[in-house]
Amino acid sequence: MKTATFSTLLALSASAVNAQVSGTAFGFAAGTTGGGSAAPETPSSIDELVEWLTDDTARTIMIDRTWDFTGTEGTTDGQCCSTRTTTCEGGTSAGQAWIQDTCDDGTWVSCTYDNAAKNPINVGSNKSIVGVGSDGVLKGKGLRITGGNSNVIIQNIHITDLNPQYVWGGDAITLDDADLVWIDHNKISLIGRQFIVSGWGKAGRVTISNNEFDGVTDWSAGCNGKHYWTLLLIGEQDFYTFSDNWVHDVSGRAPHMGTDMTESTIFFHGVNNYFQNIGGHAFDIDTNTWALLEGNYFESVDTPLTETSLTSGALIYNVPTVDSASACTSPLGYICEWNRLAGSGTWTERTDADVLTMASQYIDSLIDHIPVADVPTTVVANAGVGKL
């Protein structure tokens, strides 16, 4: 089992901080080097930024300011679909209208949305995209890794303001026919659709670590000021390490993984994440998924694990008892960490032994954990931008 504690990840020389990638990829994305030894470069214009992100050259691209794509590709005036998630009668926030071609269950309303947010930048292979201090922001534009591209690090940037008032307004990070991606120490907020989404193609080997997923919004499909579309992981053959993330003020898909619409297979190791203030559900797990969930802390989460997760055909090991924690010792070589709930809904016991059998095949990709009692303080102190 590979160890990836906060102390080892943050033990860097002063000269390295904010000058290049901080730390080393771990978990399923271990071996990801991004731009490798390429000298850090700072783009001077949006055009140069896009050119560097999309070309075939290994690069370390420093984001030292807010790159605002709003308006750079014009806007679209049209008709959006208004449903109950738009009108939000009795809700505590406005809703989201839907950018789509049909409106059988609602009424058409006039809408104007920004085009750039709906057209993500296709990131080439061998890229490190690194924010400087707390200054690195991509506004109005997401990133997509597709077409077989791989070996990408996205670290210490804030992706925000992608048509947040509209469903289908844009995704922050898309993985579709990709591999070896490390998404670390970022913040994502005010997104129209998914914070992170995989397409029908494989996302491959991915580590999502130390990120802040901030769902506070004035436009919510749940009508409660909390973003619904958090993470949708449905790729063809995917392996996820999801660790030390702060997921707060969302209302659904936090995360959703698996699908019965394809032959998708997913192994997901979720460890030491802090789920806070979730006015809906956190884990929603579908078929063809093996999920090992340990050391996660749920505070004020309505539904930590959906009921449909228990009947979908998903295989889940969620460490509900002392015995189930100790049962990890033989196949995995360590005692799993309990999950903890505070002011939250039910964490229904699931201990599918096939998950441990599957996990034993990937022992080198399983990461160490801290005590679950330390998760809220440690994660909040370290997750997000400006905390390398």
Curated annotation (Swiss-Prot):
SUPFAM superfamilies: Pectin lyase-like. Residues 1-19 form the signal peptide. InterPro entries: Pec_lyase, Pectin_lyas_fold, Pectin_lyase_fold/virulence, PEL. One of its GO terms (molecular function) is pectate lyase activity. It catalyses: Eliminative cleavage of (1->4)-alpha-D-galacturonan methyl ester to give oligosaccharides with 4-deoxy-6-O-methyl-alpha-D-galact-4-enuronosyl groups at their non-reducing ends. Glycans are attached at residue 126. Pfam families: Pectate_lyase_4 (PF00544). Its EC number is 4.2.2.10. GO terms for biological process: cell wall organization; pectin catabolic process. Disulfide bonds join 80-103, 328-336. The keyword rRNA processing does not apply. The keyword Cell wall biogenesis/degradation applies. Its main location: secreted. Keywords: Carbohydrate metabolism, Cell wall biogenesis/degradation, Disulfide bond, Glycoprotein, Lyase, Polysaccharide degradation, Secreted, Signal. It is found in: Secreted. The active site is at 253. One of its GO terms (cellular component) is extracellular region. Belongs to the polysaccharide lyase 1 family. Pectinolytic enzymes consist of four classes of enzymes: pectin lyase, polygalacturonase, pectin methylesterase and rhamnogalacturonase. Among pectinolytic enzymes, pectin lyase is the most important in depolymerization of pectin, since it cleaves internal glycosidic bonds of highly methylated pectins. This is Probable pectin lyase F-1. It comes from Aspergillus terreus (strain NIH 2624 / FGSC A1156). The gene is pelF-1.
